[in-house]
Amino acid sequence: MGKISMKGVCDMHVHTNPDLRLRAYDDFELADAAVRVGARAIVIKTHLGFTVNRAYLTNQYVKKVYGENTGFTMYGGVVMNKVIGGINPEAVEKGLKLGAKEIWLPTQSAKRHLEKMGQDPAKGIELVRDGKVVPELVDVFKLIRDYDVVLGTAHVSPEEAFVVVEAAKDAGVKKIVITHPEWWVVDMSIDDQIRLVKDYDVILERCYAQNMGGGAYKSNLPDNLELIKAV
């Protein structure tokens, strides 16, 4: 089997160093690899909040090392974990003003994440109350709409995802990505994925591998091929 060209590829979900756990690349190393293969864009992500400032510095690095015409741009976003105050419209707005391209719901602070990791889900960030999203999340949705960026569902449960997506659509959000629905923490059924696409016109993110814990990873490629056929 020959090599697959990565020219023009866009990757919207890459974790890099610095982080609280070791990643394969730091921001500059990832940019080096991206330029080498002719990638168009990468969105870097951290569970620790902001990556917009890191993306800016990386783009400056790329210009200095490779010149102005690489065709590659690195972007950042905001993850609404407890480290930035959870569902924090002010923090999100600052990130958007700095150029954030994706705003993620909670990851490690999500109730679903804590439950799947054997921790107390009650300590997670509340997104839905009495069947509706919390008011501050509506404010975040309006910002996402106004800046025309992407909402990522991150590590929320399938049940939360339906409520959140409907509210986001009602608020005028146009670009919604269901973050790695096949990951065992999210664990969204095929039927739910089909429903979300059919009813709300969302994008299903497909990751090539999933973290199984303890440093172990599982290839998603065979399962994702079947999921793509089904959806």
Question: What is each stretch, according to the model?
Answer:
Residues 37, 100, 104-136, 203:
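Active-site gating loops and adjacent loop-to-helix segments of metal-dependent hydrolytic enzymes
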Residues 17-19, 49-52, 81-84, 110-113, ...:
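Active-site environment of divalent metal-dependent phosphoester hydrolases
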Residues 55-70, 93-99, 142-145, 168-170, ...:
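Acidic (Asp/Glu)-rich catalytic clusters
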Residues 136-166:
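Internal active-site segments that recognize and position negatively charged phosphoryl groups
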Residues 11, 17, 29-53, 70-82, ...:
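Divalent metal-dependent hydrolysis catalytic cores, especially in the metallo-beta-lactamase
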Residues 103, 136, 143, 163-164, ...:
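Active-site-adjacent C-terminal substructures of enzyme catalytic domains
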Residues 83-90, 221:
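Glycine-rich anion/phosphate-binding loops
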